[in-house]
Regions:
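Mid-chain, well-packed structural core segment of small domains
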Residues: 66-77, 85
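Conserved active-site tyrosine of GNAT-family acetyltransferases
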Residues: 18-23, 80, 107
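Aromatic-flanked redox-active Cys/Sec active sites in thiol-based oxidoreductases
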Residues: 12, 42, 70
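N-terminal beta-strand motif that seeds the catalytic metal site of vicinal oxygen chelate
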Residues: 1-17, 46, 64-66
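Vicinal oxygen chelate
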Residues: 82-115
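Conserved short beta-strand elements that form part of the metal-binding/catalytic scaffold
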Residues: 29-63, 109-114
Length: 115
C-alpha cells in the first residue's frame, strides 16, 4: 500500500534561520525552496518548513521532534559544536541508548541517537 515517506512538514517563524540551521549547520541539501517554503533531504526523509499563513493556527516549534541516528554521538556533538550547534541536554546513556538533544531555531527538539 505505502511505498515510502514522502515528507514531514513543520511550521517555522523564520525561514532564513531554519535554512541556516538545517542546511548550513547540519548540512542537509536543499530539495526545493521559495520565499515561503524550504524542503531539505534529511538522510532520505524530506523535511518541509513553511511560514504560517493567516488561516494556519500551528505554532512554530510545537509540531514534532526530529530524530537522527549517528555512528558516533560524541564525534557528532564535537563536530556540531565546532559549527556553533550545542546540545541542550545530554549526552545520556540510558535504557534508550546513547542520545543527546539539540533544538532548532523554532525550539523544536532534534534528538541524536547513536546506532
Amino acid at each position: 500500500m505505502f511505498e515510502e515517506s514522502a515528507f514531514i512538514a513543520f511550521t517555522t517563524a523564520d525561514l532564513p534561520k531554519a535554512k541556516r540551521f538545517w542546511v548550513t549547520l547540519l548540512g542537509f541539501p536543499i530539495v526545493r525552496e521559495d520565499e515561503n517554503y524550504l524542503m531539505v533531504d534529511a538522510c532520505g526523509v524530506r523535511l518541509c518548513f513553511d511560514l504560517p499563513d493567516g488561516d494556519d493556527h500551528r505554532i512554530p516549534g510545537s509540531d514534532g521532534v526530529v530524530g537522527l541516528k549517528v555512528k558516533d554521538l560524541d564525534a557528532a556533538l564535537a563536530d556540531l559544536a565546532s559549527r556553533g550547534v550545542e546540545a541542550v541536554a545530554g549526552p545520556f546513556d540510558d535504557d534508550h541508548g546513547k542520545w543527546a538533544k539539540l533544538v532548532d531555531p523554532d525550539g523544536r527538539s532534534v534528538i541524536l541517537t547513536e546506532r
